C-alpha cells in the first residue's frame, strides 16, 4: 500500500449520511442500512471517497441516536448487524471507506451500565461508571446544554451528571474500567472492518477534579466562547492520554484507520492540539463553517487554519454543513448567524433567498474542493 493510500484521510471527500432520512428500503418511512446499501453506487458516482454514518446503534432515540443503549448492536429501526456488514462490504467493493459515529461522553439511561449503577446503589463500583454525588441540592452550578441543571436526583437521594439531556448520563472517564470498555468497543467495530470513527463531543469527556462550580454562573450551561477560560466541564487535559491510546489501537490495524473529533475548541491553535501525530487524525474545523460569506473573512479563516494545523503537521478539514446546522444552500441565502443556523428557520422567520443560496453553495463547494487539493500540495 503506497503512502497516498495510507494517508487517504488527508484529502478524502467524506459524505455524511443521516440514516433515518437517507433511504428507506422496506417502506416503513424510516431510512435504514439496506437503503444506504442500495444507494452506494450513486454516491460513488459523485466522486466521494468515504461515508460517515450518523448514529445507528441501539438507542431509545430520545436524542436521534446520540443516546446509545448498546454500542455493539444496530438499532432495529435501521436493520441488523448483518445489514451493516453487507453495507460495509458493498462500500469497500466500490472503493468507499466507512466511518461511524461514536458517542463516548454519555450513554442512554437505558444502557445496561447505567441500569446496573442505579440498581447497585450509592457507593457501589457500578456507580463509578458515571458521576454520582450526594447532597440535598445539585452538586454544582453546571447547567445542561438542553436547559436546566446538569444534575438529576434519583429516589435514593444521589444525583447524576448529564451535560445534555437527563436521559444521557455522563460517563466517568477517570474510571479505568470505562476506558477499557470503550477500547473493546473500538476493537469490535474495527474487527468488523470499519475505516474509522467520528467522535462526538470528545472535549466534554473530561471533568475538572472535584467537579467545581463554573466561575461564571451565567455561562454555566453554555459551550465554549473564544477568549474565555476553559470551563470545568470542557477541554480538560485528562482526555488526551485516552485519545493517544485510541490512536494506538487504530494504528495497530492494517490499512489506515482514522478518527475525526467533533472538538469545537477555539482558537484554532488550541483545536490543532487535538490533531497532534499521536491523537486524532482530524478534527472538524467549525471556524470555516461559521465564517461569513465575504472574501475577507474566508481568507482570514483559511490562512489561520493552514497556520494552526500546519504547525502540528495535520491537515485542516473544510466543513460546510452537517446535521446540527442548516444546509449551506439555505444558510448562504440569507444573513444567518450560528444560532439561527443551528436552530433552523421557522415559517414566520425571514426566509433565505433560494436562488442566491444555491449559487453561493455551488461556489462554496467548488472552492472548498480546491482548498482540499491545495492542502495536500502544501
Language model features by range: what are they?
Residues 1-378:
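Active-site and adjacent substrate-binding regions of carbohydrate-active enzymes
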Amino acid at each position: 500500500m503506497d503512502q497516498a493510500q495510507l494517508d487517504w484521510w488527508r484529502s478524502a471527500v467524506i459524505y455524511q449520511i443521516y440514516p433515518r432520512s437517507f433511504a428507506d428500503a422496506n417502506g416503513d418511512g424510516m431510512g435504514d442500512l439496506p437503503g444506504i446499501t442500495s444507494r452506494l453506487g450513486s454516491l460513488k458516482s459523485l466522486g466521494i471517497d468515504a461515508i460517515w454514518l450518523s448514529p445507528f446503534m441501539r438507542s431509545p432515540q430520545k436524542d436521534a441516536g446520540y443516546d446509545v443503549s448498546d454500542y455493539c448492536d444496530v438499532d432495529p429501526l435501521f436493520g441488523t448487524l448483518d445489514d451493516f456488514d453487507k453495507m460495509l462490504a458493498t462500500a469497500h467493493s466500490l472503493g468507499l471507506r466507512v466511518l461511524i459515529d461514536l458517542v463516548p461522553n454519555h450513554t442512554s439511561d437505558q444502557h445496561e451500565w447505567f441500569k446496573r449503577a442505579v440498581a447497585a446503589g450509592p457507593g457501589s463500583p457500578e456507580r463509578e461508571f458515571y458521576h454520582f454525588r450526594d447532597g440535598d441540592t445539585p452538586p454544582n452550578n453546571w447547567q445542561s446544554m438542553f436547559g436546566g441543571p446538569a444534575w438529576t436526583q434519583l429516589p435514593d437521594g444521589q444525583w447524576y451528571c448529564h451535560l445534555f439531556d437527563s436521559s444521557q448520563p455522563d460517563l466517568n472517564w477517570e474510571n479505568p474500567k470505562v476506558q477499557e470498555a470503550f477500547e473493546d468497543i473500538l476493537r469490535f467495530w474495527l474487527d468488523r472492518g470499519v475505516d474509522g470513527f467520528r467522535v462526538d463531543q470528545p472535549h466534554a469527556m473530561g471533568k475538572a477534579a472535584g467537579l467545581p462550580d463554573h466561575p461564571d454562573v451565567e455561562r454555566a450551561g453554555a459551550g465554549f466562547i473564544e477568549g474565555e477560560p476553559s470551563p470545568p466541564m470542557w477541554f480538560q487535559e485528562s482526555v488526551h492520554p485516552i485519545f493517544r491510546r485510541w490512536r494506538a489501537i487504530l494504528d495497530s490495524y492494517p490499512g489506515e484507520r482514522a478518527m475525526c473529533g467533533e472538538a469545537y475548541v477555539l482558537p484554532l491553535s488550541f483545536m490543532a492540539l487535538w490533531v497532534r501525530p499521536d491523537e486524532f487524525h482530524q478534527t472538524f474545523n467549525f471556524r470555516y463553517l461559521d465564517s461569513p460569506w465575504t472574501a475577507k473573512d474566508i481568507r482570514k479563516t483559511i490562512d489561520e487554519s493552514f497556520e494552526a494545523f500546519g504547525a502540528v503537521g495535520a491537515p485542516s478539514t473544510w466543513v460546510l454543513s452537517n446535521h446540527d446546522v442548516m444546509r449551506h444552500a439555505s444558510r448562504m441565502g440569507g444573513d444567518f448567524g450560528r444560532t439561527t443556523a443551528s436552530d433552523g428557520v421557522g415559517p414566520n422567520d425571514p426566509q433565505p433567498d433560494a436562488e442566491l443560496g444555491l449559487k453561493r453553495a455551488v461556489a462554496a463547494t467548488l472552492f472548498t474542493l480546491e482548498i482540499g487539493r491545495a492542502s495536500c500540495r502544501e
